[in-house]
């Protein structure tokens, strides 16, 4: 029987999320297609919640000018711990049987996207599982 495990992670790390659509365009283009979690949790005249998770959306460039200003408001805890690789094997008389996996688990308080990626529109890391048989001749 054999076993291998590898964790990777990052601590004391912040993620600046002000490049998030629909705020990416700043003063140039008003908000058009809005991510659902922003549309559901933004400040508006109809919902003047001072603790709204996201700032005002707008249809004119004057409405959204301050949304991309760098601020600690946009900082989020980007710490994470990932089970990067796991392999379990069993030796048989003429070889070995094994199961291995990559990117199986992630623990993080940041839930908008994978904190190991550079931004919200990066391709996600693939989760893979392999089952194998090694034979010795």
Question: Where are the predicted features?
Answer:
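C-terminal beta-signal and terminal closure region of outer-membrane beta-barrel proteins
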Residues: 41-51, 68, 106-137
């Amino acid at each position: 029987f054999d076993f291998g495990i590898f964790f990777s992670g990052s601590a004391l790390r912040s993620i600046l999320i002000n490049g998030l659509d629909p705020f990416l365009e700043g003063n140039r283009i008003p908000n058009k297609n809005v991510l659902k979690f922003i549309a559901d949790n933004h400040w508006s005249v109809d919902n003047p919640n001072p603790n709204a998770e996201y700032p005002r959306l707008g249809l004119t460039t004057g409405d959204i000018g301050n949304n991309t200003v760098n601020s600690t408001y946009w900082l989020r805890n980007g710490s994470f711990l990932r089970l990067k690789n796991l392999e379990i094997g069993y030796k048989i008389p003429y070889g070995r049987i094994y199961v291995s996996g990559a990117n199986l688990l992630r623990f993080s308080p940041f839930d908008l996207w994978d904190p190991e990626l550079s931004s919200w529109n990066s391709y996600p890391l693939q989760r893979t599982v392999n089952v194998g048989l090694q034979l010795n001749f």
